[in-house]
């Protein structure tokens, strides 16, 4: 599992008494000095609420999943999906959730998989992905002139932002990565040099970005 793979490295750091922090994705059981990132399950819970509003409360919704070596790409993605499903079970238990797995090491199959999905599921007009590659779906929608599909993704990769501005992605959820990195280094400095107490868990705001506000966000977070 992802925590087990991470533990192989952090165990060596602990043996050498080297402090470490986690950024973006947390594994609390590995006892990092600090964590900076979103509360992943709450982020997924929030994303579900936004997706249902965006899709005008559809009867079905698709989760586009990025699979790497037989599993989701990160612990964070798993927790986002858990939060998403929790919201749906609590508020829209009758909404059908469909999964479409795309494979990180077989990108040449993406188009065929999405062709089949959209042909077989014309009633589903709303989707979400919990990884940073929403552009894969967004660029497909642009290339096939599918203008009525509603889509939410994560992270401000250049291609994601381009899809947002072209209307293929409706919302991006941002995580303030620059702030995460800066705060993480600051925590290490405070711990190692100034011998200060460091807060162990530091959640970042869940920021929803649209074409109307994304440039302001990008300008505000330039360093």
How does the language model describe each region?
Residues 35-61, 176-193:
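Hydrophobic alpha-helical segments within soluble ligand-binding/sensing domains
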